[in-house]
């Protein structure tokens, strides 16, 4: 009785098996390929501050979240567009045209903030001091920066034109009075900014630095109210421009009244919805808190808009208190 011998693989089959094993084996860790980085899936990587890595043109990514039926936005809110624009621009310290918009509502005169010596002061006095410190510090960093002052009550007024001399802006910063405001004309504010400034245009967003950038800093404090605003086509282009930034410091009462239709959180979220690029900074400070909070917020706005990371990735701690948090945060 003959026993069948097990079939031996041919030379061709052995070569195919060796090729499959080599293709499945990851590349060795070399100096040009540390930790096998080139073999990792690119889609699983997340870049910190990818908005301004210095390469890549403005791109858009679809937002997969859909609103549930019947849960539409409130009438006073501006719904963000479906595609979220992600901007990548060169990280350069080009000149800034900073337009500081100061709210002059009567809430700014309420002595609720706690000053450094423990006494009570109002938000207007603190805002005036922190604006002057901001302008003078930015001027020391780069003397080509220009500044303008706009006051906001029921209407908007352009008090100081764009100037590189901090003394010109500070000369009209302190002779201001608050007033009772019934509405907030946000549309008029942006229309005034469009009239007074011109946004730069470059041939290639990814490689050519702009001659300057335009940044608006709104220091706002009043009860939540329906702003007068409609997103026109020129305003939409302004917000989508990679060289325009809209920073907000919102001073609120810190309490939500049940009988009110809106809360300060709704108003703060509305301000944030205007930034479709994710490049602006938004801060909220309680009116009854310490004045130091306001100064800290203004100090964080000293960074150049093209050189700072996204706000969610920014960290201002010098000590690594939380190892896990510091791994995903970019220290400024």
Curated annotation (Swiss-Prot):
The keyword DNA damage applies. The gene is BABAM1. It is found in: Cytoplasm; Nucleus. The VWFA-like region is similar to the VWFA domain. Its presence reveals similarities between the structure of the 19S proteasome and the BRCA1-A complexes. Its main location: cytoplasm. InterPro entries: BABAM1, vWFA_dom_sf. The modification N-acetylmethionine is found at residue 1. Residues 98-301 are annotated as: VWFA-like. It comes from Bos taurus (Bovine). One of its GO terms (biological process) is response to ionizing radiation. This is BRISC and BRCA1-A complex member 1. GO terms for cellular component: BRCA1-A complex; BRISC complex; cytoplasm; nuclear body; nucleus. Component of the ARISC complex, at least composed of UIMC1/RAP80, ABRAXAS1, BRCC3/BRCC36, BABAM2 and BABAM1/NBA1. Component of the BRCA1-A complex, at least composed of BRCA1, BARD1, UIMC1/RAP80, ABRAXAS1, BRCC3/BRCC36, BABAM2 and BABAM1/NBA1. In the BRCA1-A complex, interacts directly with ABRAXAS1 and BABAM2. Component of the BRISC complex, at least composed of ABRAXAS2, BRCC3/BRCC36, BABAM2 and BABAM1/NBA1. Identified in a complex with SHMT2 and the other subunits of the BRISC complex. The modification Phosphoserine is found at residues 32, 52, 60. Keywords: Acetylation, Cell cycle, Cell division, Chromatin regulator, Cytoplasm, DNA damage, DNA repair, Mitosis, Nucleus, Phosphoprotein, Ubl conjugation pathway. Component of the BRCA1-A complex, a complex that specifically recognizes 'Lys-63'-linked ubiquitinated histones H2A and H2AX at DNA lesions sites, leading to target the BRCA1-BARD1 heterodimer to sites of DNA damage at double-strand breaks (DSBs). The BRCA1-A complex also possesses deubiquitinase activity that specifically removes 'Lys-63'-linked ubiquitin on histones H2A and H2AX. In the BRCA1-A complex, it is required for the complex integrity and its localization at DSBs. Residues 70-83 have a biased composition (Pro residues). Belongs to the BABAM1 family. Residues 10-23 have a biased composition (Acidic residues). Disulfide bonds: none annotated. Residues 1-88 are annotated as: Disordered.
């Amino acid at each position: 009785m003959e026993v069948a011998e097990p079939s031996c693989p041919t030379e061709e089959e052995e070569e195919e098996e060796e090729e499959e094993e080599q293709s499945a084996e990851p590349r060795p860790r070399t100096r040009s390929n540390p930790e096998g980085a080139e073999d990792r899936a690119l889609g699983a990587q997340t870049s910190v501050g990818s908005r301004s890595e210095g390469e890549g043109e403005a791109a858009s990514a679809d937002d997969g979240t859909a609103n549930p039926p019947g849960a539409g936005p409130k009438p006073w809110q501006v719904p963000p567009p479906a595609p979220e624009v992600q901007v990548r621009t060169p990280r350069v310290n080009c000149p800034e045209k900073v337009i500081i918009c100061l709210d002059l509502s009567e809430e700014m005169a309420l002595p609720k903030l706690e000053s450094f010596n423990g006494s009570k002061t109002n938000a207007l006095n603190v805002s005036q001091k922190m604006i002057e410190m901001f302008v003078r510090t930015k001027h020391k960093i780069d003397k080509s920066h220009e500044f303008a002052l706009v006051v906001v009550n029921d209407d908007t007024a352009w008090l100081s034109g764009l100037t590189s001399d901090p003394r010109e802006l500070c000369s009209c910063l302190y002779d201001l009075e608050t007033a009772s405001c019934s509405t907030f004309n946000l549309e008029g504010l942006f229309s005034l900014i469009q009239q007074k400034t011109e946004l730069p245009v470059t041939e290639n967003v990814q490689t050519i630095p702009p001659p300057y950038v335009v940044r608006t800093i709104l220091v706002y404090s009043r009860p939540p109210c329906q702003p007068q605003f409609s997103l026109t086509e020129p305003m939409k282009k302004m917000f989508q421009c990679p060289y325009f930034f809209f920073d907000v410091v919102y001073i609120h009462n810190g309490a939500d009244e049940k009988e009110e239709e809106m809360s300060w959180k709704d108003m703060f979220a509305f301000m944030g919805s205007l930034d479709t690029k994710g490049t602006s900074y938004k801060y909220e400070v309680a009116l009854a808190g310490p004045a130091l909070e306001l100064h800290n917020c203004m100090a964080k706005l000293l960074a150049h808009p093209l050189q700072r990371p996204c706000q969610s990735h920014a960290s201002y701690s010098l000590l690594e208190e939380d190892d896990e948090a510091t791994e995903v945060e970019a220290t400024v």
